[in-house]
């Protein structure tokens, strides 16, 4: 053991916590992320857990992981491989070691590497370190036993004490990165406010883990420190995408001066939006947990008709079920925000994994001519702005809007600067005015935008009926006239097509790139990182990442036709590439497609894009 520890200063580091589904790896990772964001580091996280409610203990399929990338400056992805791997049992080491760098430090709980544990993890010998050929530094500590020793006088039973193992590992990682434990203490006291004894037990164990590292130097000769660089002044917090989405909905309702209503049915990975909004009744938020997906959407449409900012949240299977109700919002031309947190499909598919396979469903997955704006969030923190933009678009253009996120984005988190709501654009719904009373009809439109005016129930002189049957363009009465139906289909389509959206920005070597990377939604960080890496290596690469998918930005064709080689990278089998080919004459891109349920790997992107450049 060295007398003094060397502190290595790093610009960035990746830590991966892994263990059984019940080992609390998500909580440990979240707390460490929260500490890092609070002290001023940028972060990007990736929770990775099985779909089982509780997989068999110690099994290879039941391993839960949480990876966080911490940077002194901006970070865009959770990282391809980790600098520190926490493996709380044999199965975690077996399945997660592939994510460790050759220079990584590995922390294991030796108490969970007994023969029965090794057998479950399919090890052939009693020395997994040797069997796997692990050459990295290994901190092998009897964590379970030390936790029981620490809490011996707590009065807790053995099972309850072992639930604190994750906090020992967290304390050890905090020591390794010279983190102050105060933030973790406050987090735990808030989380277990109704169970203070549990909070104090966990806090005691965190300190035990920290002290173990400090007093023994834990088999390593150095610790780390990730510096913080100057950021835009303000208050920062670690925020998940689902929470950011919820906050964006609340902010838009506040800006528009409307109550917020969410009708929803619980579904992975979107349920946290419902949970978060249910906490904010004091802000004028009403949430209804409905009996099914259709009801969730239908109640939201009713709330919209009554004058609320209405939303519904779901995932791909739920969008299938909501499609008829979403079409009701299309034909009645009522504002509605549909949040689709995409997951692996088809059918039940991969509930806890991520894909971008709902794009064409969002664009076209309804009967009839059913135009609907579609926005895709690029990152966890961007979800706030994307949700706000979706609400503004829905309210000002009297249309349902689909907001696409995905499992990777929704479950991940980032360091978020609390915004100044005053700086956000006003939201001005097209309400009827007093002078319209004498000649009001439900589908009276603004001649420039094609948007119908919004008359709320209870306004004298504006009584009207809406419904799912086609309406006369003048009177609002039910109509089956062929010419009228043709007109109404075109009016609804033109209204959406006229919605102004920002131009798509080209990053990197925008003027003279030899390759343009095109993507949308939650792949932004990985595509940007691949572009940066290639440009640092002397290549000329640019990135055009789309947020607005319908309508597309006005400069889309100009951007796509400017470069000799264009590759569309997406987590599906080519939906966005096909859509762009449909919209842009003569556009024939290269494609990079994966549907693994996992985020892109930056090194794999670089290899694939380099191969395209060399053709």
Question: What positions do the PLM features span?
Answer:
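Active-site cofactor/cluster-binding pocket
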Residues: 1-256
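Gly-rich Lys/Arg/Thr-decorated short loops/hinges at beta-loop-alpha junctions or inter-strand turns
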Residues: 12, 51-52, 149-151, 218-234, ...
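Thiamine diphosphate
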Residues: 12-100, 268-364, 373-395, 536
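Short glycine-rich or small-residue beta-strand-to-loop segments that form or flank ligand, phosphate
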Residues: 13-20, 169-171, 260-263, 310-313, ...
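A glycine-rich phosphate-binding loop feature that marks nucleotide/adenosyl-phosphate handling sites
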Residues: 49-50, 205, 226-230, 265-269, ...
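Short gly/pro/ser/thr-enriched loop/turn and capping motifs at secondary-structure boundaries
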Residues: 50-54, 113-117, 146, 294-296, ...
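Conserved thiamine diphosphate
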Residues: 79, 134-144, 353-402, 406, ...
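Flexible, low-complexity linker and terminal segments
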Residues: 239-248, 256, 391, 395-615
């Amino acid at each position: 053991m060295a007398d003094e520890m060397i502190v290595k200063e790093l610009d960035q580091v990746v830590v991966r916590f892994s263990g059984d589904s019940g080992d609390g790896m998500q909580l440990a990772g979240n707390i460490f992320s929260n500490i890092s964001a609070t002290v001023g580091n940028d972060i990007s996280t990736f929770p990775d857990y099985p779909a089982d409610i509780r997989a068999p203990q110690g099994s290879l399929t039941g391993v839960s992981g949480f990876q966080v990338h911490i940077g002194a400056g901006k970070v865009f992805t959770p990282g391809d491989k980790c600098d520190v791997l926490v493996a709380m049992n044999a199965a975690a080491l077996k399945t997660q070691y592939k994510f460790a760098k050759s220079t990584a430090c590995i922390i294991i709980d030796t108490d969970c590497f007994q023969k029965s544990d090794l057998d479950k993890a399919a090890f052939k010998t009693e020395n997994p370190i040797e069997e796997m050929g692990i050459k990295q530094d290994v901190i092998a500590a009897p964590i379970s036993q030390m936790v029981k020793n620490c809490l011996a006088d707590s009065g807790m039973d053995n099972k309850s004490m072992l639930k604190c193992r994750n906090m020992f590992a967290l304390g050890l990682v905090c020591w390794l990165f010279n983190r102050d434990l105060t933030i973790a203490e406050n987090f735990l006291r808030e989380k277990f406010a109704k169970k203070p004894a549990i909070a104090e037990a966990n806090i005691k164990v965190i300190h035990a883990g920290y002290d173990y590292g400090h007093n023994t130097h834990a088999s390593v000769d150095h610790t780390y420190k990730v510096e913080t660089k100057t950021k835009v002044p303000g208050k920062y917090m670690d925020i998940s995408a689902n929470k950011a989405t919820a906050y964006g909905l609340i902010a838009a309702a506040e800006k528009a001066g409307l109550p917020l209503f969410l009708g929803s049915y619980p579904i992975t990975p979107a349920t946290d939006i419902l949970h978060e909004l249910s906490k904010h009744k004091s802000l004028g938020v009403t949430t209804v947990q409905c009996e099914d997906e259709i009801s969730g959407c239908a109640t939201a449409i009713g709330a919209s008709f009554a004058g609320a900012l209405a939303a519904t949240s779901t995932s791909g299977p739920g969008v299938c079920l909501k499609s008829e109700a979403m079409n009701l919002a299309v034909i009645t031309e009522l504002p509605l925000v549909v949040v689709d947190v995409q997951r692996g499909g088809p059918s039940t598919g991969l509930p806890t994994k991520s894909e971008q396979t709902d794009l064409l469903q969002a664009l076209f997955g309804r009967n009839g001519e059913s135009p609907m704006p579609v926005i895709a969030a690029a990152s966890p923190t961007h979800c706030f702005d994307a949700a706000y933009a979706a609400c503004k678009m829905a309210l000002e253009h009297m249309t349902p809007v689909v907001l696409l996120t995905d499992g990777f984005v929704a479950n991940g988190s980032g360091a978020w600067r609390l915004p100044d709501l005053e700086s956000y654009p006003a939201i001005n719904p097209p309400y009827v005015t007093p002078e319209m009373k004498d000649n009001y009809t439900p589908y009276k439109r603004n001649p420039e935008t094609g948007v119908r005016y919004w008359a709320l129930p209870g306004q004298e002189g504006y009584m009207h009926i809406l419904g799912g049957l086609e309406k006369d363009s003048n009177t609002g009465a039910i109509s089956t006239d062929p010419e009228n139906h043709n007109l109404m289909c075109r009016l609804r389509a033109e209204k959406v097509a006229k919605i102004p959206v920002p131009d798509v920005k080209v990053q990197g070597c925008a003027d003279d790139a030899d390759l343009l990377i095109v993507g949308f939604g939650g792949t932004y960080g990985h595509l940007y990182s691949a572009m940066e890496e290639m440009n640092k290596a002397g290549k000329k690469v640019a990135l055009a990442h789309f947020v607005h998918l319908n309508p597309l930005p006005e400069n889309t064709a100009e951007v796509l036709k400017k470069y000799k080689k264009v590759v569309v990278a997406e987590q599906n089998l080519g939906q966005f590439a096909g859509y762009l080919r449909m919209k842009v004459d003569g556009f024939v891109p290269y494609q990079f497609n994966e549907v693994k349920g996992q985020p892109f790997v930056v090194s794999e992107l670089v290899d694939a894009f380099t191969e395209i450049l060399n053709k």
